[in-house]
UniProtKB/Swiss-Prot annotation:
Protein name as catalogued: Serine hydroxymethyltransferase 2
UniProt subcellular location: Cytoplasm
InterPro entries per record: PyrdxlP-dep_Trfase, PyrdxlP-dep_Trfase_major, PyrdxlP-dep_Trfase_small, Ser_HO-MeTrfase, Ser_HO-MeTrfase-like, Ser_HO-MeTrfase_PLP_BS, SHMT-like_dom
EC number: 2.1.2.1
Gene Ontology annotations for the cellular component aspect, listed alphabetically: cytosol
Organism: Burkholderia lata (strain ATCC 17760 / DSM 23089 / LMG 22485 / NCIMB 9086 / R18194 / 383)
Site (Plays an important role in substrate specificity): 229
Protein family (similarity comment): Belongs to the SHMT family.
Catalytic activity: (6R)-5,10-methylene-5,6,7,8-tetrahydrofolate + glycine + H2O = (6S)-5,6,7,8-tetrahydrofolate + L-serine
Biological process (GO), any one: glycine biosynthetic process from serine
Protein task: Catalyzes the reversible interconversion of serine and glycine with tetrahydrofolate (THF) serving as the one-carbon carrier. This reaction serves as the major source of one-carbon groups required for the biosynthesis of purines, thymidylate, methionine, and other important biomolecules. Also exhibits THF-independent aldolase activity toward beta-hydroxyamino acids, producing glycine and aldehydes, via a retro-aldol mechanism.
MF (Gene Ontology): glycine hydroxymethyltransferase activity; pyridoxal phosphate binding
Keywords associated with the record: Amino-acid biosynthesis, Cytoplasm, One-carbon metabolism, Pyridoxal phosphate, Transferase
Pathway: One-carbon metabolism; tetrahydrofolate interconversion; Amino-acid biosynthesis; glycine biosynthesis; glycine from L-serine: step 1/1
Length: 415
C-alpha cells in the first residue's frame, strides 16, 4: 500500500525533487519567450498526476482490448467531444503522444513510402516533420518544398506551380517560425487541383484558432494535426482532427499502427484543457496574446531590429539580429543570463549554421499567461534590445535581471 502523505517525491527522491524545485523557481523568475512554451493550469497538471496513469486501455472508447475501461472511456470521449466542438471538426483522435506522432499517423494512414509530399521548407519556417531530410518524413517520402517570396510571405504562386509539376499525394501546411496568417483556403484549392490531400499542422496556432483570432483550417483541410500544449495551453501531447470519412484509417494508424496503449492521464489533461479553451476567458487571453506580440514586435523595430515578414499577425515572430552584429546563439545566451528565455532560430536563407543562426524566435503566450499586458510587452521589448546592444556588459545584464525580477514578482505564474 502507498501512503499519500509519506510517498512524495521529496521523500522518495530528494535529488530529483531538488531539480524539480529549481525548475519551478526558474519558471517563476525568468520571462519565458520561447514561442512553443506556455504554462499549463493546475487542473491540467492534477489530471496528469491522477491514478489514470495506472490504466491500460488499448483501443478506443467502447472497443478496448482490456477490461475495466468503463471510466477511462468517459475520459477519452470527453476529450474527443470537446476538441471537436472547439474546432468544429467532424472527427478526432486524441491519442497521439505528440504533434510529431500525429503527423506520422496521417502519413502512415494515407501514404506509402516513396509517395510525394509537399511541405514548407524548414529553412523558411516549416517544421522537421514536414519533409526535412533528417526526419522520417524526409527519408520515407519524396519531398518537394515550398517557401517564402521576396516579401517573406508564403509564395502561393510558386507552391501552385510545384504542385502542378510534381503532383504530390499530400500537401502539408503549417509552420514553426512564420508570423503571418496562412491562407488555408488557397492551399486547399491547390491541393484539390492536383488531387492531393491537405494536412494542416496547426500546432503553433491552435490556441489562437480555438479563440477565433487566427484562421481556422478545419473547414478546408482533410486532416488537421496539432500539439495540445504551446498556445493551446494543455498537456504535452497531440491530436488529429479529420473529416468523418477518414476516421477509421486514422484510428487504425494510431492504434495499432504506430502506438500501443494510450496515455490516459494525459488524455484527461487534454480534456481539461479543451474545456478551459471553450471558455470566454480563453478567448480574451488569446486576444491579449496577439496584442502583446504586436507590441513586442513594434518595440523591437523601433529599437533597430528587423522582424522577418515585417510584422506578426499571430503570437510568434522571428527577429533578424544582423543589424546588431550578434548571432542567435550569442543572443540566446546573453538574454538567458538576463533571465529572458528565447531560442536561437534560423532566418530565411540564413548564412549561419543551424546551431549558430542569425535570428531568435520570440512568442507571447507564456508571458501573457502570467498576466503581462501591452505595457509589460513594451518593457520586455526594450529590455531585449538593451541586452542585444550590450550583450557582454555586466552592468547592463545586472540591471535587466533586476527589472525582470520586478516584473516576475508582480506577475507570478502560479499564485
Amino acid at each position: 500500500m502507498f501512503n499519500r502523505t509519506t510517498s512524495t517525491v521529496a521523500n522518495v527522491d530528494p535529488e530529483l525533487y531538488a531539480a524539480i524545485e529549481q525548475e519551478n523557481r526558474r519558471q517563476e523568475d525568468h520571462i519565458e519567450l520561447i514561442a512553443s512554451e506556455n504554462y499549463t493550469s493546475p487542473a491540467v497538471m492534477a489530471a496528469q498526476g491522477s491514478q489514470l496513469t495506472n490504466k491500460y486501455a488499448e483501443g478506443y472508447p467502447g472497443k478496448r482490448y482490456y477490461g475495466g475501461c468503463e471510466y477511462v472511456d468517459v475520459v477519452e470521449q470527453l476529450a474527443i467531444d470537446r476538441v471537436k466542438q472547439l474546432f468544429g471538426a467532424e472527427a478526432a483522435n486524441v491519442q497521439p503522444n505528440s504533434g510529431s506522432q500525429a503527423n506520422q499517423g496521417v502519413f502512415f494512414a494515407m501514404l506509402k513510402p516513396g509517395d510525394t509530399i509537399m511541405g514548407m521548407s524548414l529553412a523558411h519556417g516549416g517544421h522537421l516533420t514536414h519533409g526535412s531530410p533528417v526526419n522520417m518524413s524526409g527519408k520515407w517520402f519524396n519531398v518537394v518544398s515550398y517557401g517564402l517570396n521576396e516579401n517573406e510571405d508564403i509564395d502561393y504562386e510558386a507552391a501552385e506551380q510545384l504542385a502542378q509539376e510534381h503532383k504530390p499525394k499530400l500537401i502539408v501546411a503549417g509552420a514553426s517560425a512564420f508570423s503571418l496568417k496562412i491562407d488555408f483556403e488557397r492551399l486547399a484549392k491547390i491541393a484539390k487541383s492536383v488531387g492531393a490531400y491537405l494536412m494542416v499542422d496547426m500546432a503553433h496556432y491552435a490556441g489562437l484558432i480555438a479563440a477565433g483570432v487566427y484562421p481556422n483550417p478545419v473547414p478546408h483541410a482533410d486532416f488537421v494535426t496539432t500539439t495540445t500544449h504551446k498556445s493551446l495551453r494543455g498537456p504535452r501531447g497531440g491530436v488529429i482532427l479529420m473529416k468523418a470519412e477518414y476516421e477509421k484509417p486514422i484510428n487504425s494508424a494510431i492504434f495499432p499502427g504506430i502506438q500501443g496503449g494510450p496515455l490516459m492521464h494525459v488524455i484527461a489533461g487534454k480534456a481539461v484543457a479543451f474545456k478551459e479553451a471553450l471558455s470566454p476567458e480563453f478567448k480574451a487571453y488569446q486576444e491579449k496574446v496577439v496584442e502583446n506580440a504586436r507590441v513586442l514586435a513594434e518595440t523591437l523595430v523601433k529599437r533597430g531590429l528587423r522582424i522577418v515578414s515585417g510584422r506578426t499577425e499571430s503570437h510568434v515572430m522571428l527577429v533578424d539580429l544582423r543589424a546588431k552584429n550578434i548571432t542567435g546563439k550569442a543572443a540566446e545566451a546573453a538574454l538567458g543570463a538576463a533571465h529572458i528565455t528565447v531560442n536561437k532560430n534560423a532566418i530565411p536563407n540564413d548564412p549561419e549554421k543551424p546551431f549558430v543562426t542569425s535570428g531568435v524566435r520570440l512568442g507571447s503566450p507564456a508571458m501573457t499567461t502570467r498576466g503581462f499586458g501591452v505595457k509589460e510587452a513594451e518593457i520586455v521589448g526594450n529590455l531585449i534590445a538593451d541586452v542585444l546592444e550590450a550583450p557582454e556588459d555586466a552592468a547592463t545584464l545586472e540591471r535587466v535581471r533586476g527589472q525582470v525580477a520586478e516584473l516576475t514578482k508582480r506577475f507570478p505564474v502560479y499564485g
